[in-house]
């Protein structure tokens, strides 16, 4: 079990039947002043979503990489406030933000953005109906996206097809 505790990321052994002090992992995981929102483990990496961007820590090399929004780079994160992180059945990392979803490309070490607006005021069909993404859930080849005001979006990873579900009062 990975937790945010005292400005860092620690591990608690689940086998212990009592509350215990978290195990210190690495000084690289000390993140003072960083508002951590979500932690996700993928193989030998820990992905940390925060209000200050995304951190990816490699447990073998003990190296930390910090990803942030860059207005001059369309392959950077779409926004720095990370609301959720999930892994698809194809082992692709998805990063939810207040401005859409970001698909991590391990080959290029950058992101593909999925959001409502192209940036030119044009609304794209078959995409998110709200950029403010609260949560992600992956179920095989399906990605469920919970949004702030757009309701639930159902994405198919293979075709990046999005279906929108929302309440009409």
Which residue ranges define each predicted feature?
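Carboxylate-rich, polar loop motifs that coordinate divalent cations or form catalytic acidic clusters
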Residues: 1-169
């Amino acid at each position: 079990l990975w937790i945010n505790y005292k400005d860092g990321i620690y591990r608690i052994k689940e086998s212990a039947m009592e509350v215990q002090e978290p195990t210190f992992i690495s000084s690289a995981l000390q993140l003072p002043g960083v508002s951590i929102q979500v932690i996700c483990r993928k193989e030998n990496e820990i992905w940390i979503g925060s209000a200050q961007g995304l951190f990816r820590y490699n447990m073998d090399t003990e190296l930390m990489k910090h990803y942030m929004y860059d207005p001059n780079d369309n392959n950077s994160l779409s926004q720095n406030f990370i609301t959720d992180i999930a892994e698809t059945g194809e082992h692709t990392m998805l990063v939810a933000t207040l401005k859409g979803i970001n698909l991590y490309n391990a080959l290029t070490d950058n992101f593909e953005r999925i959001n409502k607006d192209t940036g030119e005021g044009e609304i794209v069909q078959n995409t998110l109906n709200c950029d403010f993404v609260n949560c992600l859930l992956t179920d095989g080849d399906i990605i469920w996206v919970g949004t702030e005001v757009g309701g639930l979006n159902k994405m198919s990873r293979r075709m990046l097809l999005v279906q929108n579900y929302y309440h009409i009062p």
